[in-house]
Amino acid sequence: MLQPKRTKFRKVHKGRNRGIAGGTEVSFGTFGLKAVGRGRLTARQIEAARRAMTRAVKRQGKIWIRVFPDKPITEKPLEVRMGKGKGNVEYWVALIQPGKVLYEMDGVSEEIAREAFALAAAKLPVKTTFVTKTVM
């Protein structure tokens, strides 16, 4: 599972998921999976989608993960009264804005890449679309 090796602070404020995305172009591979909606991906979801893609391409080609879960999400235990401080870190998420390229792929045909990204998209909570590298 992806998570930072070390952080400056253990816990962060909830914040808001606004603004525009960086990393909107396919830069490493030939094909990409781009987010259309806004949301957050957990480390488990990122890994599940990666595994689905890897199996679909039968370990051919190369896959790049363009998102990293760097925000800790805390939860309080069940049946605990409010107050008494912030809960413990339970999992890590990556905040996703529309236009962000989530995964990239190279070394496979377009139809295999489309199939693999469709399987990966089914594992993700944000709407996505298939994109190809634009050559200038």
From Swiss-Prot:
Pfam families: Ribosomal_L16 (PF00252). The lineage of its organism: Bacteria, Pseudomonadati, Pseudomonadota, Gammaproteobacteria, Pasteurellales. It comes from the Bacteria. Disulfide bonds: none annotated. Part of the 50S ribosomal subunit. Gene3D superfamilies: Ribosomal protein L10e/L16 (3.90.1170.10). Binds 23S rRNA and is also seen to make contacts with the A and possibly P site tRNAs. The keyword Ribonucleoprotein applies. Keywords: Ribonucleoprotein, Ribosomal protein, RNA-binding, rRNA-binding, tRNA-binding. GO terms for molecular function: rRNA binding; structural constituent of ribosome; tRNA binding. Belongs to the universal ribosomal protein uL16 family. The keyword Ribosomal protein applies. GO terms for biological process: translation. GO terms for cellular component: cytosolic large ribosomal subunit. This is Large ribosomal subunit protein uL16. Transmembrane segments: none annotated. SUPFAM superfamilies: Ribosomal protein L16p/L10e.
